[in-house]
Amino acid sequence: MSDNGSDSRECRSRRERGISAYAATFAVSEQEVPAAFAARVGPAFAEEALQAAGGAAWSHPGLTGRERSMAIITALTVQGISGDRLTTHLRLGRQHGLDQEALTALMTLLAGYVGYPRASLAMETIHGSFTSTDQSDTAQ
């Protein structure tokens, strides 16, 4: 650490950016993030994740929010992850401009590379997320 404490300030700033990223991802207040995340995954892992989320990968200007969402949704699909984890990133992707047509095209493309079982599992979650949103929109 330097004498002027800049490493400490950078660490805090990175943590604060991570907290902001998780608050946006999970639609909770920034004040809730550290304790809720630590309760879910343990304090040591939570702290590492907060630091990582505040790093350059999540804020680099070379990727738009839409592109970042597509990359994360692709990574989750490749790993066969669905449910709440995928739903959370689908919601964030929609906020970044991904619509059902774009996500369907993405899954169709991925099916040829990662296989239909994984792509169709993700597509079921995508379809369900748009169906439930459409139903709640028409109920209002």
Question: What residue spans do the PLM features occupy?
Answer:
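Acidic, glycine/proline-rich low-complexity segments that act as flexible tails and inter-domain linkers
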Residues: 1-65, 119-140
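A generic alpha-helix surface/boundary motif
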Residues: 16, 48-52, 69, 84-88, ...
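Amphipathic alpha-helical segments within well-ordered protein domains
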Residues: 55-58, 87-94, 107-111
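Structural motif
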Residues: 61-67, 97-101
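Short helix-coil transition sites and intra-membrane helix breaks within transmembrane domains
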Residues: 62-63, 79-84, 116-118
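Short, structured motif recognition centered on aromatic/hydrophobic residues
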Residues: 67-76, 86, 106-110
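Substrate/cofactor-recognition hotspot
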Residues: 69, 114-120
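Extended intrinsically disordered, low-complexity coil regions enriched in Ser, Thr, Gly, Ala
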Residues: 82-102, 119-130
